[in-house]
Amino acid sequence: IEQTNIPNQFSYLWPYSGTFSAVNALFEATHDKKYLRLLDKRVLPGLEEYFDTQRTPNAYSSYIQTAPASDRFYDDNVWLGIDFTDIYQITGEQKYLDKAQLIWKFIESGTDNLLGGGIYWCEQKKESKNTCSNAPGSVLAFKLFKATNDSVYFKQGKDLYEWTQK
């Protein structure tokens, strides 16, 4: 049987993470607590199925943890960090900021001085530093600065923004 003919049992991280963004947007627009409950009881527990604690720094993998190890993409994690920071800004609940900061540690691990800086696209394939990782990476750093007032995030956001402009 060809593997290409067998559909995956679960979604990849990238499409599943859109659920987090959507529920965040609904909660932000309505402030209806049912969306926060949906996030905490359904969306985030599902998201945790992708959280990889076997590799450090910890981060979200592209597929669930009960499957063989899968690639970890910096851009996918950046968007999750943005969502966690946004929901923290709305609720003030520390658990969301903690997760965003944990994700940022993974994002930092995807930077080096080759090409003058920037974030790679994929941890396992350090072949490209794309705008899809760097532009939202800058946004996440600035959002973390706003949430924490830690100037390190501001500097990192500025550096990524300037690198992306080159």
Tell me what each language-model feature is.
Residues 1-166:
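Glycan-recognition and catalytic cores of secretory/periplasmic carbohydrate-active enzymes
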